[in-house]
């Protein structure tokens, strides 16, 4: 080392052999103004032999104004098949008067098949104004995602520490624990894996390293920002149900309940339709049956209406005939001098009639009907009925004649059989009983016919006679 830092020692790069020979670098001392000394780059062997960097055992001293001699670690590369490359820790470095110390960590890469590369971070001593800058190396995992772990580091006086962490190729988690500075400005971006596995970062414990601040320590806690509820105007296709407002969640829940209710109703209708279809198939037959019954009831009602009209007219005629009959009977009961004049005429006598006839006029003001025509018509109807009765009696007599002839024929047959066979007394008794039985049956038949005729005559007298007497 010279007074103005002109003493510079450089080591030529040493290339690793085919199977990874080792190259060692001796310790270098800085100059008064901190002239930098660089170390050679180390390369690993073809099949992953270990390339070892020897540490600088000598404590490096800074210049008068804190221009620290910067020592750069060479880039370490792993072997072809992932043999481990180990980089030893840096020697402890002391800051200058104004703390302008800069230290750079080398970049370390894993092997082809993901062997772990571990880099140790030395403890850094901050300067007076805490301007120490410590960039962390970008750690890359192996081909199959072996984890890379970064050692904790402490910030400077004003906390300008930056930590970067990289994940593995297939997304294995890389964890970084970093200590904040005095004011807690810690940035820790983390990237996910190649196939989307999440990178988990634990909550940082802000343990400030006390600097030149009268021994007081400042702790900064991480602020937790609550989730923002999304209303209907800001909803998107990627919005989760739990991110919505409570009122909107309740409305969606109600809509879902209504949809489920409709689904249950639809299932109930589907279960009801088969049996209901069978019932509907029987409706045409029932309709035809009810139609026939309705038509029959309508025809019956029409017949009843006609019958009622006829009965009403018949009752009216019977009432008129009864009134005339009663009037005629009352007139006949009186002596000859009290008989009403003009009773048997079509109209009641006019002004020339007797006062008695005028006094005996109908109280209701109705005129007398033509009793002669009435009784003449009734007599003609009775004559027709008598002719019917005579015809019926003639038929009965003819039937009785036939019965008598049959009885005589049977009697003759019986006599002939008696004379021819000369049978015993028992046979004659049997024949006589048979003849009497047949005769009795014939008499009963004739009596039935006569009874029917008598009933018909009585019915005509009670109904037809009164019905045709108008």
Swiss-Prot record:
Low complexity: compositionally biased ranges: 20-31, 75-92, 197-206
Coiled-coil portions: 239-270, 375-401
UniProt entry keywords in alphabetical sequence: Coiled coil, Membrane, mRNA transport, Nuclear pore complex, Nucleus, Protein transport, Repeat, Translocation, Transport
Keyword Coiled coil attributed: yes
GLFG repeat spans: 17-20, 45-48, 63-66, 79-82, 96-99, 111-114, 127-130, 142-145, 156-159, 168-171, 181-184, 193-197
InterPro entries in the cross-refs: Nucleoporin_FG_rpt (IPR025574), NUP58/p45/49 (IPR024882)
Subcellular location: Nucleus, Nuclear pore complex; Nucleus membrane
GO cellular component, one term: nuclear membrane
Example of a GO biological process term: mRNA transport
Function: Functions as a component of the nuclear pore complex (NPC). NPC components, collectively referred to as nucleoporins (NUPs), can play the role of both NPC structural components and of docking or interaction partners for transiently associated nuclear transport factors. Active directional transport is assured by both, a Phe-Gly (FG) repeat affinity gradient for these transport factors across the NPC and a transport cofactor concentration gradient across the nuclear envelope (GSP1 and GSP2 GTPases associated predominantly with GTP in the nucleus, with GDP in the cytoplasm).
Family statement: Belongs to the nucleoporin GLFG family.
Domain notes: Contains FG repeats. FG repeats are interaction sites for karyopherins (importins, exportins) and form probably an affinity gradient, guiding the transport proteins unidirectionally with their cargo through the NPC. FG repeat regions are highly flexible and lack ordered secondary structure. The overall conservation of FG repeats regarding exact sequence, spacing, and repeat unit length is limited.
Matches recorded under PANTHER family: NUCLEOPORIN P58/P45 NUCLEOPORIN-LIKE PROTEIN 1 (PTHR13437), NUCLEOPORIN P58_P45 (PTHR13437:SF2)
Protein name: Nucleoporin NUP49
